[in-house]
């Protein structure tokens, strides 16, 4: 399909994402990319450790992870996400959308863009939900 006749702009979107990613990675350089990866890892593991301190919430202690992990919640993940959204936090992915038996499981991703204070606020809001 020629771009002029295409009914979708998927090719343009893919091109723009590829270009933005290339620019970002080239600006970071080899050492910068490693630093970003280490930040992702450290922040995600900090978040997981803090989540484990909230009553009723648990990150699988034996499953290794980089910057995404599954959290077992004491209530359905959809309710957790509603509570988080009420506090201006976009929660994790509700695994029950793909696996109905995982109703209380939430997939959380932490990146270099998340500050420590944002992670701490997230933990505080989770703690409020577990107190209710």
Question: Which residue stretches match the model-derived regions?
Answer:
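Active-site C-terminal subdomain of aminotransferase-like
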Residues: 1-55, 59-62
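Conserved PLP cofactor-binding pocket of PLP-dependent enzymes
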Residues: 62-64, 86-107
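Short, glycine-/Ser/Thr-/acidic-enriched flexible segments
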Residues: 15-17, 23-30, 74-77, 96-98, ...
């Amino acid at each position: 399909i020629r771009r002029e006749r295409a009914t979708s702009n998927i090719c343009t979107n893919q091109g723009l994402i590829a270009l933005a990613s290339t620019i970002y990675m080239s600006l970071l350089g080899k050492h910068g990319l490693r630093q970003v990866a280490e930040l992702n890892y450290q922040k995600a593991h900090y978040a997981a450790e803090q989540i484990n301190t909230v009553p009723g919430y648990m990150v699988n202690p034996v499953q290794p992870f980089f910057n995404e992990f599954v959290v077992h919640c004491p209530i359905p993940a959809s309710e957790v996400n509603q509570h988080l959204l009420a506090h201006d936090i976009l929660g994790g992915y509700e695994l029950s959308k793909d696996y109905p038996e995982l109703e209380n499981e939430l997939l959380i991703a932490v990146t270099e863009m998340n500050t420590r204070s944002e992670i701490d606020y997230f933990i505080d809001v989770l703690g409020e939900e577990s107190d209710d």
